[in-house]
Design a protein with these regions (language model features):
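Membrane-interface helix-loop junctions in multi-pass transporters/channels
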Residues: 54-56
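Short, charged, amphipathic alpha-helical segments
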Residues: 6, 28-37
Length: 56
């Protein structure tokens, strides 16, 4: 579970950095990377939900 949390934190950091670059600098490549990161976060959150339910 701890490794999953680390993956989520890393992916969120990537999302935040790239989304900020898109908004502040208009960096289109950063927009693509931020959308990819948000998609990966969605998958990780679903995995988190499944793992946390099993842990209860």
């Amino acid at each position: 579970m701890e490794e999953l949390i680390k993956k989520i934190e890393a992916e969120f950091t990537s999302f935040k950095q790239n989304a900020t670059q898109l908004v502040n600098k208009g960096n289109k490549a950063a927009g693509v990377r931020s959308r990819r990161a948000s998609s990966n976060l969605d998958k990780l959150f679903k995995e988190w939900r499944a793992v946390s339910v099993k842990a209860e």
